[in-house]
Regions:
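N-terminal mature ectodomain segment of secretory-pathway/periplasmic proteins
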Residues: 80-161
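Flexible, processing/modification-adjacent segments and terminal tails
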Residues: 156-213, 244
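N-terminal leader/targeting segments and the immediate start of mature chains
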Residues: 48-98
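Gly/Pro-enriched, hydrophobic low-complexity segments
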Residues: 208-273
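Hydrophobic membrane-insertion alpha-helices, especially the h-region
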Residues: 29-39
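Membrane-helix boundary connector in multi-pass membrane proteins
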Residues: 9-25
Length: 273
């Protein structure tokens, strides 16, 4: 906002005192457009920040306790092994997480583009707040995906000003429920004792899960290796929103690393088949 005011004052001085005012005006126009875009992106992001702040205040009022081996006894053996491998036993139960991503994505048949994102998940009442800044054709395209109160919305705007996509509805709710459960499996395995999950054993290296959040019901099959690592998550309940078509969705994991004494996924992919 300060930059916008400065440009306006500069333009007044240019018009009043400079014979070749058009050259200064062009420079001011460029600065003004950049300042407006920066302000618009910050304003667009403010809803994300406000939502995060609100959920953090609720979470802080919730007392925590430890996740023990007794808590995981009802889970299928490969899921128990995964939780032990992850290092979450005898640690505080997870109430929320913050995830920062650097990556690339693309729509089917289109070119890759880079993105950076910040994401908060809250697990007592499943919530996912995901803010992304993508760069397409040299332009910044921010997007806010939120899943709150069992309802999902996606809002993408060029420079935070011009609508590119706005999606909501039953398909969006179901698709984001898959994403929320995928986050639980990959990013917060301690939450896999959640009572909303119904586990179905398959064999020593795979298990099926049904996850229900209100009217949103999804399922997925989790695949593990002999070490206990979760190596893939496959669901047939994920939609590609811009097409509103249901595709098989998988997230193969190819690398783990140790962070604060826990084995955490370090590299993975999200694939629509």
């Amino acid at each position: 906002m300060v930059a916008i005011i400065a440009v306006v004052l500069s333009q007044i001085l240019i018009i009043g005192s400079w014979r070749d005012a058009k050259f200064g005006s062009i420079a001011n126009l460029i600065v003004l457009l950049v300042a407006i875009a920066a302000w618009a992106i910050q304003h667009f992001e403010s809803q994300f920040r406000n939502d995060v702040r609100s959920h953090l205040q609720i979470t802080k009022a919730t007392p925590g306790d430890l996740l023990t081996e007794a808590d995981i006894q009802s889970l299928p053996q490969p899921v128990q092994k995964y939780l032990k491998y992850s290092g979450v036993i005898n640690r505080p139960r997870v109430k929320n997480i913050r995830i920062v991503f650097d990556g690339e994505m693309r729509s089917k048949g289109k070119d890759w583009f880079p993105f950076q994102s910040v994401q908060y998940n809250f697990f007592d009442d499943p919530t996912r707040l995901f803010f992304m800044k993508a760069r397409m054709f040299g332009m910044v395209v921010p997007g806010y995906h939120d899943y709150q109160d069992k309802t999902a919305r996606m809002n993408i705007k060029l420079f935070g000003l011009f609508p590119v996509m706005h999606a909501k509805g039953p398909e969006m709710n179901k698709a984001e429920t898959v994403t929320v459960f995928n986050d639980m499996c990959l990013m917060a395995p301690a939450t896999l004792i959640d009572k909303r999950i119904q586990w179905v054993p398959i064999d020593n290296t795979s298990s099926k899960a049904h996850f229900t959040n209100g009217m949103n019901k999804i399922s997925a099959i989790l695949y593990f290796n002999e070490k206990g690592e979760l190596v893939n998550f496959i669901s047939d309940d994920r939609y590609v929103i811009d097409e509103m078509k249901q595709y098989r969705f998988s997230t193969p994991v190819k690398e783990y690393k140790v962070i604060n004494g826990m084995n955490v996924m370090a590299y993975g992919e999200a694939v629509w088949h």
